[in-house]
Structures are given as structure tokens and as C-alpha cells.
Design a protein with these regions (language model features):
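Substrate-binding surface in catalytic domains of secreted glycosidases
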Residues: 1-105
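Second-shell loop/turn segments in exported
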Residues: 42-49, 129-133, 157
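Glycan-binding loop/region signatures in secreted carbohydrate-active enzymes
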Residues: 76-146, 175-176
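Acidic/aromatic/glycine-rich contiguous surface patches that form carbohydrate-binding/processing clefts
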Residues: 139-176
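A generic secondary-structure signal marking the coil-to-beta-strand transition
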Residues: 70-72, 130, 151
């Protein structure tokens, strides 16, 4: 039996309502949904899954939540969000990993964020500002390396067919 749960931070109704220790006692595995750090209901733009946030929450699972590492499966995203700022409001749309490049205009500069372990792109179009924290093989590698660092049970992915062609070779390299 596996049970998927969100990160142990944030909303009392969304993520703080789970007793992960008890779930860990009765389930064979807990799948930590290591994504939606900034989701559809977020009031501000941000990454889907910064490596620093993922690691901090793995530590919470192991520490304050009391879940054994051998029971934790790290869920990782094969998607990101494009955030749109327009007249002071922020909205987002989900973009599959394999479609990210086609959603960023040619010539847009990307910059590496070393704490998030992600590239970031920002551009203007039609009077709106677009921001994207890029999920790709490089950003996913950092998250998968945490599986090894903390001796977790393994990794899971949301969701198949959203990934780029280079992902599975990297997954095999990191986790085998």
C-alpha cells in the first residue's frame, strides 16, 4: 500500500492535516509529492519544485514527521508552470516538460538559480510579463540525487508522457 501526501508545510487543510508518522506505520510507502511548491492557487509566482524546498521537506519527513527513509518515495514533476503577471494579478498555466522550450520565445535569456537548481526565464509579450522556472533533466537530477543522499525507497513521476526524451537515461544513471 502506498499513500501520496503533500509536503509538510503550508495550509492546515491541504498539507498540515496528515499524520505522516501514522501513515508511515500502516503504509508500505509514502509518496512525497515533491511538487506544487507554488501551485495553481499560489498568490505569487514561483517554482514548481525547487531542490532546496524538496530537500527541506525530505528532512521534515525524516525528522519531525518520523517517517523511515526506506518508506519514502520522492514524487517529482514532469511539468512546470508559466506565470503571467498582468496589471498586478498573477495567473499560471501548466506546461509539460517536453513543451517548455516551445513556450519560451527565441532569444529569451535563461539564468541558473543555484539554490533552486533550476534555470529561470522571464520575458515580456503583449504588455504582460511571463516567468518560468524550468523543469528539465538538470533540475530533475538534483531532486533524484536526494533519493540517494537520504537513502529513500525510490522515485515516482508526475506524470508519464510529459517528460523530454533525455529524462530516462538520466534517471537510470542517477538511481542505478
Amino acid at each position: 500500500l502506498s499513500v501520496d501526501v503533500t509536503a509538510p508545510d503550508g495550509s492546515p487543510d491541504w498539507s498540515l492535516c496528515y499524520d505522516r508518522n501514522v501513515i508511515g506505520d500502516v503504509a508500505d510507502y509514502i509518496v512525497f509529492m515533491g511538487y506544487d511548491q507554488n501551485g495553481v492557487s499560489s498568490p505569487k509566482e514561483g517554482t514548481t519544485a525547487g531542490c532546496d524546498w524538496v530537500e527541506a521537506n525530505i528532512k521534515k519527513f525524516l525528522g519531525q514527521e518520523g517517517v523511515e527513509a526506506s518508506k519514502i518515495i520522492l514524487g517529482t514533476p514532469f511539468y512546470t508552470r508559466i506565470w503571467t503577471e498582468n496589471n498586478g494579478s498573477v495567473t499560471s498555466k501548466v506546461v509539460n516538460m517536453k513543451n517548455i522550450a516551445s513556450n519560451i520565445p527565441d532569444g529569451t535569456k535563461t539564468t541558473w538559480d543555484d539554490s533552486l537548481k533550476q534555470n529561470y526565464a522571464e520575458y515580456e509579450k503583449g504588455g504582460k510579463t511571463y516567468k518560468i522556472w524550468i523543469e528539465d533533466a538538470k533540475s530533475l537530477r538534483c531532486k533524484l540525487e536526494l533519493v540517494n543522499t537520504y537513502n529513500l525507497a525510490g522515485a515516482a513521476y508526475w506524470e508519464k508522457d510529459r517528460e523530454t526524451d533525455d529524462i530516462w537515461d538520466m534517471v537510470s544513471e542517477v538511481l542505478n
